[in-house]
A protein has these predicted regions:
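Short, compositionally biased P/S/T/A/G/V-rich stretches that sit at domain boundaries
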Residues: 396-407, 482
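Conserved, well-ordered alpha-helix/loop/beta-strand core segments that scaffold catalytic motifs
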Residues: 379-400
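Bacterial N-terminal signal peptides
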Residues: 7-16
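Terminal low-complexity, poorly structured segments
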Residues: 5-8, 76
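N-terminal, motif-rich segments that launch catalysis or mediate targeting to/interaction with membranes
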Residues: 21-214, 218-221, 225-371, 375-378, ...
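Positively charged n-region of N-terminal signal peptides that target proteins for export
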Residues: 1-5, 18
Length: 482
């Protein structure tokens, strides 16, 4: 009898609460934010000049899955197969897609399988990830994933499914097991130069671009209020759609439905930051997660309803509401509490709707509606794209210039922030068949280093995995022998 009651309870929990933590809609919002960032960045020029891809972002690049271990190839193939062909970021039967399509595809598959979503939260005020575990909500979410995503009872009983806790996104960004994270980006970008065969280099470039998209997704979620305010229960478990498996918060659904793939602003100005981590969080408070948490409410981080009776003053109601806030910012401005039943808005100094509120019998109710979401999206979306464009520029800030004439090549590092502190330049000679062999290793220097080039060399390429004042980087460059 007890087991039967537990089964019924679990079914009710699933029916009421099942969802996943995916933040901005991958196929629409993440895709277009990534696209806008890439187009506004220097990536087109970098691909054309440093990697000899003359069409830049529109250069066809082939991904060969047989270059990967079988388990990784199967995982990547399955995730790429979920992409909608109408999205414009799927490869053809030959595995070829434009460079830009690979970046967008990486941003979409970054949170597959679904339990990866638990590692995309970051609370900059506490330096922590998602912490909403426990209780029936956690059970319901896990069972929902089991039924919806086919995770199976083995995963449920071994604890491998999403339990509403996760590591900080800043940690997941660097995790070796994240195949579309920073380590994958750096390693594959190296191989895109150092690989012996053209097919190997092309496949590595495709995977580097996929990883670039995954890195951008981590950053983009730092511009989603629920993801920087530890808000999973309210934002993601309160399913607004007709189905219990209608995924996503009200805000992300509003953004996807309002803007789609075409409605986001096209004018994007890249944001500059001193280090990679500073794009997300920094002591100056200008990381995207810092700025988002400080300026915007999410559905689950609003003030608690304030009790109002005949003896309650407006000041007392305000004090109660402010005292219930889980974060110091944004601050709750003065409220208009005289009129019963009318919807009001609290505004920021720049006339942006911060939240909606309404006095009803016995209390003041705080909530977010479409007008608040519209103001939030209007401010946040261009800012996210600007941070994304800046991050791409930051990752490709250093470049290796190769000037190959006759039997000599001058190899130099440009664009590094300060002195290059570690790493060596690996130089390669490419023959008429496109095969590359290691030529030599030299120390980086702004003045350049001359390298002897063997007869028959058609192209000289170089790569450096190093570190400068802004952190780790991979610099690449190649040039035909004149």
């Amino acid at each position: 009898m007890k087991a039967a009651r537990i089964a019924v309870l679990a079914a009710l929990v699933v029916a009421g609460w099942a969802t996943d933590a995916r933040a901005y809609d991958p196929a629409t919002t993440h895709a277009v934010l990534t696209e806008r960032a890439a187009l506004a960045s220097e990536l087109h020029r970098v691909l054309g000049r440093a990697l000899s891809r003359p069409l830049g972002l529109f250069e066809p690049v082939a991904l060969s899955l047989d270059q990967l271990p079988p388990d990784r190839a199967q995982s990547l193939e399955g995730r790429l197969a979920t992409l909608d062909p109408s999205s414009g970021c799927t490869a053809g039967p030959d595995g070829v897609a434009p460079a830009l399509a690979w970046v967008i595809a990486g941003s979409i598959i970054a949170k597959t399988p679904a339990e990866r979503g638990q590692d995309f939260f970051y609370d900059p005020s506490r330096g922590s990830g998602l912490s909403n575990a426990g209780g029936l909500a956690s059970l319901g979410n896990t069972l929902g994933l089991l039924l919806d995503a086919g995770g199976g009872f083995r995963a449920f009983f071994t604890g491998t499914q999403f339990n509403m806790t996760g590591r900080p996104s800043t940690e997941w960004l660097h995790a070796p097991e994240n195949d579309v994270g920073l380590e994958a980006f750096h390693a594959n970008l190296e191989t895109a130069i150092a690989g012996e065969q053209p097919q190997l280099r092309a496949g590595a470039l495709a995977r580097a671009l996929l990883a670039l998209g995954g890195v951008l997704t981590v950053l983009e979620d730092a511009g989603e209020p629920a993801h920087v305010r530890n808000d999973y229960r309210r934002a993601y478990l309160g399913t607004p759609g007709p189905s219990p498996f209608d995924r996503g918060s009200r805000f992300e659904q509003f953004v996807a439905e309002t803007y789609g793939r075409m409605g986001l602003p096209t004018a994007v100005k890249p944001t500059e930051r001193p280090t990679l981590m500073a794009f997300i969080t920094a002591a100056d408070g200008q990381g995207l997660a810092d700025r988002t948490q400080r300026r915007f409410f999410s559905d689950g981080s609003l003030p608690d309803d304030a009790i109002v009776d005949h003896g309650t003053t407006a000041a007392e109601a305000m004090a109660d509401a402010r005292g219930s806030l889980p974060y110091a910012y944004p601050r709750l401005p003065r409220l208009e509490l005289k009129v019963m039943g009318r919807r009001h808005y609290a505004y920021t100094r720049d006339k942006r709707r911060l939240l909606a509120y309404q006095r009803v019998p016995g209390r003041v109710r705080f909530f977010l509606d479409d007008a608040v979401y519209a103001d939030t999206a209007r401010v946040l979306l261009p800012e996210i794209a600007g941070y994304g464009a800046g991050l791409i520029n930051h990752l490709f800030r250093a470049e290796i210039r190769v000037d190959a004439t006759g039997g000599l090549a001058l190899v130099s590092v440009v664009g590094a922030r300060g002195a290059v502190k570690k790493g060596e330049i690996r130089v390669f000679a490419e023959d008429a068949a496109g095969l590359r062999k290691a030529l030599t290793t030299v120390q980086p220097g702004a003045a350049g280093v001359r390298v002897n080039v063997p007869a028959g060399t058609k192209k000289v390429a170089a790569v450096l995995r190093g570190e400068d004042d802004a952190g780790e980087f991979v610099a690449v460059g190649e040039s035909a022998v004149k």
